[in-house]
A protein has these predicted regions:
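Bacterial N-terminal signal peptides that target proteins for export
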Residues: 2-16
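Glycan-recognition and catalytic cores of secretory/periplasmic carbohydrate-active enzymes
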Residues: 31-425
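C-terminal motif of bacterial Sec signal peptides marking the signal peptidase cleavage site
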Residues: 26-27
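Sec-dependent N-terminal signal peptides
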Residues: 15-23
Length: 425
């Protein structure tokens, strides 16, 4: 019988090769920059192999109560990892969960890096179980779920079936567009609180729509994405270029009703991952449109982040930039990975600040590697510790979370490609 591995919080800093050689070695305090991508990708391969065993164990040992609740809600079978629970157990989610596409995306990244068909087959397996989500019109998270999984798969294989699934996903997402307000509706829940909420996270789902226009030649998707990005730029941001988490719209008049948070400290605070989504989202929008307004927005968000008095020296943000207990507040490694990945891309578009953007991205990657990495063959196969989902409700606080790992690997691949070829796209 397989023994369940508990979460271990000791962080080893040795390269993989040294870990495998055994005793008698002295721990390194930093990773040589030339080896940091290779080391982390070797580590990721080992950890994700470990994750397959953890997934099998979690599925086999799901409690009757959990199974009954899942079936009652019509959530379908458990598919992919989301996070480690406080007791060290692995939390798996069904395809309906907004995080279900990140794990298969990681597998596609490993296939891209290694060209090993083992990772391709595993990626196909964990991607295909999400296909039914292409028709799920009850969520804005089609980009997270479908583009991170099927999108990476199509990019690497040109599988026509994946293309059709992605186009249907884009059609489904476009049904949530509200023309009067000019935005894509986010949540359908909390209808007693919001009429038509839009969260900053939704910027990340626009890449699917841009892709759909390029593949289908139908400009509808492009126009929806640009409208959403422009409206978000107008209404989500404060004068200092920090952003709100939730903006509530009147779908008849298009007027803003409320400016709130749901996962940050307070309505007027700067939730760290929200700022990261904004930086990444507008950088990506500039890539897809070449509209200068989006590049300027990304640059302003970056400036806000890296001149903030509460940005830590290691550049791994606290969960909210206005959290009252800083420096004794939980960090959010997931925000750091999103920021790093975005900075590598942003460095391609702003020659004046390119060196600074890349240097800060490199610092984030180095600090995550040396101080935030999990323990080899443990921690349920996750890569990074110390992410924070929703601090105020004590959900996913200071634990490994799958999207931190996804954007960490993406950042590593971008760093590798940038340093080898000088360009990303």
């Amino acid at each position: 019988m397989k023994l369940k591995l508990s979460t271990v919080t000791i962080k080893l800093k040795l390269p993989i090769a040294a870990l495998l050689l055994g005793a008698g070695l002295t721990a390194c305090t930093s990773q040589p920059d030339s080896n940091i991508v290779e080391d982390n990708m070797e580590f990721a391969q080992q950890q994700l192999r470990c994750a397959f065993d953890e997934i099998d164990y979690a599925v086999a040992n799901e409690s009757p109560e959990s199974r009954a609740q899942r079936e009652k809600n019509g959530w379908g079978p458990l598919t992919n990892p989301r996070n480690t629970e406080p007791d060290g157990t692995l939390h798996l989610v069904p395809s309906k969960d907004w995080t279900s596409g990140f794990f298969p995306g990681e597998l596609w990244f490993l296939y891209e890096y290694t060209q090993n068909n083992f990772w391709k087959k595993k990626a196909q397996q964990h991607t295909d179980i999400l296909e039914q989500e292409k028709m799920n019109g009850g969520t804005h998270d089609m980009g997270f779920k479908m583009y991170c999984s099927f999108g990476n798969g199509y990019r690497l294989t040109q599988d026509e079936r994946y293309k059709e699934i992605l186009l249907q996903s884009a059609r489904t997402l476009s049904t949530r567009f509200k023309p009067k307000a000019g935005i894509i509706r986010s949540w359908d829940h909390n209808k007693d609180k919001w009429q038509c909420p839009v969260i900053i996270d939704n910027m990340m789902n626009l890449e699917l729509l841009f892709w759909a226009t390029k593949e289908s030649k139908d400009s509808t998707y492009y126009n929806i994405a640009v409208s959403h990005a422009r409206t978000t730029m107008k209404n989500h941001f404060r004068a200092d270029y920090s952003c709100y988490h939730v903006i509530d719209y009147d779908t008849i008049t298009g007027q803003v009703l409320k400016k709130n948070t749901h996962q940050g400290l307070a309505h007027e605070s700067a939730w760290a991952r929200g700022q990261a989504w904004a930086l990444y989202g507008y950088t990506m929008c500039y890539r897809e449109t070449k509209l200068p307004e989006f590049l300027e927005q990304a640059k302003k968000v970056e400036q806000y982040l890296f001149t903030h008095k509460n940005m830590p020296e290691d550049l791994i943000p606290y969960w909210d930039f206005d959290a009252p207990g800083i420096p004794n507040e939980p960090r959010d490694a997931s925000a750091a990975t999103v920021i790093a990945s975005a900075l590598y891309e942003l460095s391609q578009y702003d020659r004046k600040n390119s060196e600074r953007y890349k240097k800060n991205a490199d610092r984030i990657v180095e600090n995550l590697t040396n101080s935030y990495r999990t323990t080899l063959n443990k921690d349920n196969g996750f890569l990074l510790l110390h992410s924070t989902g929703t601090k105020l409700t004590n959900v996913e606080v200071d634990v490994p979370i799958v999207y931190a790992d996804y954007y960490f690997i993406e950042a590593l691949l971008r760093k590798d490609k940038l340093e080898k070829t000088g360009k990303l796209f």
